[in-house]
């Protein structure tokens, strides 16, 4: 289990939100100084033991304190408007040199940011003529420039996804937090499950899945390269790194060659057993090399055997490859009545996959041993082979769109600019068909059934 700490500790991975709404990723190492540019700097040791999601203020050079929350003040309506005001540089009486001097004093700790903002408002010609709403807006905008405050955010799906969308959206295939949440919900992700994942988003989705169940799951990751690209896992901390997840038994990795050619792969990595007597006579470096190769082979064999056994609880595909080329190898490994999801930034790709999956079927062979009278060992001839077909049902293509709103008294409205492309998800469920004809409804009774029912009625009357 990967449990989240309630307080900040050494070597914690955190996100720092600045007054300008920009977010920075920082690993808090002991005896280290965190620089926030024009917003100042502070010692990482001062954050240890503090709670996440709190807002801090740099009140002196490299010294911070928790900022107390203030009560929301409701502003009464007024008849004054801003129609007659002109927004120009001449409204500010302070020169640029004086403003630069204010910034230098704030950074040096000789002047508080609140006092500097007050000087700016006092030297503005039009500040008093503005409405109360406009005045608050002006102060807030100046606070984004001068206030030396920051908020420490805990790594989670929303924070990491928004950070990657702002910095490198192509690396994660434009995957948003809303899309991740939808896929986890459709996949019925819960603790204790086994999941098959194809993740080419830098393991952005993989980290979200593990975070959702706090590491209580078994995941097989299929990747196209020699080693998986897990660059996004570091944003959740040291416990989420690939080596740590493999060591804890949460993650197993296979590349496409190992998936499509398991026998050839095992033969390439196979190591002959050496007796203990010969091992004792070997040089130390040769023995270590042999033990490393043997451990690698055993680990790979266990991973391939686990993959070949199939019966996964859900299948998630986030890849740049054609979805059907991936599904034809992995869909047979999915358990019966289990969901699968395919993510793509293009709807047409999923529409073609939708039509191909509607015609898809796979031969399902199940061997069942017939019982004998003496309950003896079942021979090969006593094994019955039940052949059925696997199909997919409930195919659907979901378009992800969210509309954030500004929620304020008498000023609630949607944001004017939002992302227009949030991706598409194809979902479905794999089922097992039956050879017999199934029917439901009310049907007329046969002659034999009518006679039997009449006899039962006569007995009841007697």
UniProtKB/Swiss-Prot annotation:
It comes from the Eukaryota. GO terms for molecular function: tRNA binding. It is found in: Nucleus. One of its GO terms (biological process) is tRNA methylation. Residues 449-462 have a biased composition (Basic and acidic residues). Residues 442-462 are annotated as: Disordered. One of its GO terms (cellular component) is tRNA (m1A) methyltransferase complex. InterPro entries: TRM6. Keywords: Nucleus, RNA-binding, tRNA processing. Signal peptide: none annotated. Heterotetramer; composed of two copies of TRM6 and two copies of TRM61. Substrate-binding subunit of tRNA (adenine-N(1)-)-methyltransferase, which catalyzes the formation of N(1)-methyladenine at position 58 (m1A58) in initiator methionyl-tRNA. Belongs to the TRM6/GCD10 family. This is tRNA (adenine(58)-N(1))-methyltransferase non-catalytic subunit trm6. The lineage of its organism: Eukaryota, Fungi, Dikarya, Ascomycota, Taphrinomycotina.
